[in-house]
Amino acid sequence: MAAVFDLDLETEEGSEGEGEPEFSPADVCPLGELRAAGLETVGHYEEVELTESSVNLGPERIGPHCFELLSVLGKGGYGKVFQVRKVQGTNLGKIYAMKVLRKAKIVCSAKDTAHTRAERNILESVKHPFIVELAYAFQTGGKLYLILECLSGGELFTHLEREGIFLEDTACFYLAEITLALGHLHSHGIIYRDLKPENIMLSSQGHIKLTDFGLCKESIHEGAITHTFCGTIEYMAPEILVRTGHNRAVDWWSLGALMYDMLTGSPPFTAENRKKTMDKIIKGKLVLPPYLTPDARDLAKKFLKRNPTQRIGGGLGDAADVQRHPFFRHINWDDLLARRVDPPFRPSLQSEEDVSQFDARFTRQTPVDSPDDTALSESANQAFLGFTYVAPSVLDSIKEGFSFQPKLRSPRRLNSSPRTPISPLKFSPFEGFRPSPGPPEPMEPSLPPLLPSPPSPPPTSTAPLPIRPPSGTKKSKKGRGRSGR
């Protein structure tokens, strides 16, 4: 079976308790009591019916029933994103974002399967102040669920739309936090490859968080290259477009395009269609507005060097070379990493449940996670083995006991981004999710996170119970934003 069902068994000499007397169930409990309890003995063994209640003996079983839907935050072809509240177990009352994906739509598309697997694996393995945190991952017969920290500040795209352009000090702050996040990914051999305002969220305090890791490439260390054609055209480096092979330097080109976008109102190379946009990226002239300071002009030029070996950040120094540029001379990097620097913008939020920074077209909808009775074949389900995950911080809190901490611009289009990503197609559809390196993973779909148990039977066609609807009357909430990916 997949690694998710691997159990570490005692194999050392003497682990069987040499010299200790053998015993039977009758030595522990009289036979009559065993039969009264519904257990029958066969020789020295007992037969016990395996049910959900008999194998789920841990302090918490994670599943859709643990969350109450509050609002719809976004919607796409892959599924929905909800704001939810945890109503059972550890972190009772905490607000999360819940991404729900339909398995049937994912398995029929190579790129969506690759996207989902990459995002799930990277969210588990990478922890950083400026990268979104994954709390839980679980699945039912027809759906996948990712429970993420709720970033109520909305997308940087929305904020940039409202402001038009940023002052250099504002742009410097966001670019510096993004630089630290990219540097951390690169140190783990991960290329991000889809940096754009839509994939950068703001926390309630105004700090950035990178999201959407489906186009990432893993295991790309110094000297390694990859050839996959993917990303969002306006932010794609020329070496991706000409398919000569690329490495982590593509992220610094994208950061340069984002910097240009922040300071001028649009990416550096745009046209009426993708073909002409690509031509401009490959051979067009970079035009910088005269109002940029010399440091900003110099950094933008160095980010947007077409030769990746000449691009700032493209050498061995990676993010360290970017951090040393005079544009960031006023940044205290230690304070920035510790989030001791006040953000230039702090979202105006009335409560943890405030969704005013998201698109009102979605937040006005009644949140419903409809039952899905789709039954996938055994071979199709192979793509989702090992999906379940519980964050180590959650496991720690389970061990310690329950905690309660309810804690004027025309080029852009706010309704939906005109920039759609191109996903990679090179992958093995049955390459499973990486098993957690830490505590044992809960059994599929929602078995206990702490106690190892026998593997559960494969999913049946029985539809899972829908997540409970919000109590009371749905309040109308105002706000703007754009949908999911």
Swiss-Prot record:
A Pfam family it matches: Pkinase
The reaction(s) this protein catalyses: L-seryl-[protein] + ATP = O-phospho-L-seryl-[protein] + ADP + H(+); L-threonyl-[protein] + ATP = O-phospho-L-threonyl-[protein] + ADP + H(+)
Enzyme superclass (EC): transferase
Protein name: Ribosomal protein S6 kinase beta-2
Source species of the chain: Mus musculus (Mouse)
Modified residues (Phosphothreonine): T420
Phosphoserine PTM sites in chain numbering: S15, S417, S423, S476
Annotated InterPro entries: AGC-kinase_C, Kinase-like_dom_sf, Pkinase_C, Prot_kinase_dom, Protein_kinase_ATP_BS, Ser/Thr_kinase_AS
